[in-house]
Regions:
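Intrinsically disordered, low-complexity proline/glycine-rich segments
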Residues: 1-157
């Protein structure tokens, strides 16, 4: 089971573990969606498109900027991730839930859910996805949740 736990209540920094063993960390940008992470000693940058619906993870080690994965239509009911020569489909569990489901056909085969409404973080079970792609998917979902939380608290009027 992949877990992302927030390391500070004031920053968008997360520690990723698989079955309790540390595998990476993710530091989100405070001024825009996305962030940085290191996976198996390689540096990766996650960038959001202009309107936040598309995210791309690139391997930036040695200035290569090789695209590893892309997520499209994020924050919509249905969205996709393309990586490792495949497309993975996700959908929101329900209108009232933040949980995201990995689907094959109409069957849910995996999920990403919040650990806590107050502390943030996520827990994911994403069978069939490589570890780098799992980390990307969870980082994208964390960024989406942070954006939604910021928008909900912004209000005013």
């Amino acid at each position: 089971m992949l877990r992302a736990e927030k390391t500070s209540p004031w920053r968008g920094a997360y520690e990723f573990t698989v079955d309790g063993a540390p595998v990476s960390s993710f530091s989100s940008h405070w001024w825009r969606s996305g962030g940085r992470m290191t996976i198996d000693g390689r540096d990766h940058e996650i960038r959001a498109g202009r309107w936040g619906g598309t995210y791309t993870m690139t391997d930036t080690t040695d200035g290569a900027d090789r695209v590893v994965a892309t997520a499209e239509r994020v924050a919509r009911k249905h969205w996709t991730v393309t990586a490792d020569g495949r497309s993975y489909r996700f959908r929101r569990a329900s209108m009232w839930s933040s949980e995201q489901l990995l689907v094959e056909g109409e069957q849910a085969i995996g999920s990403i859910r919040k650990l806590s409404w107050w502390r943030g973080g996520a827990e994911a079970e994403l069978p069939g996805l490589s570890l780098p792609v799992q980390l990307f998917v969870v980082a994208v979902v964390l960024s989406m949740w942070e954006q939604q939380s910021a928008a909900a608290s912004g209000g005013g009027g």
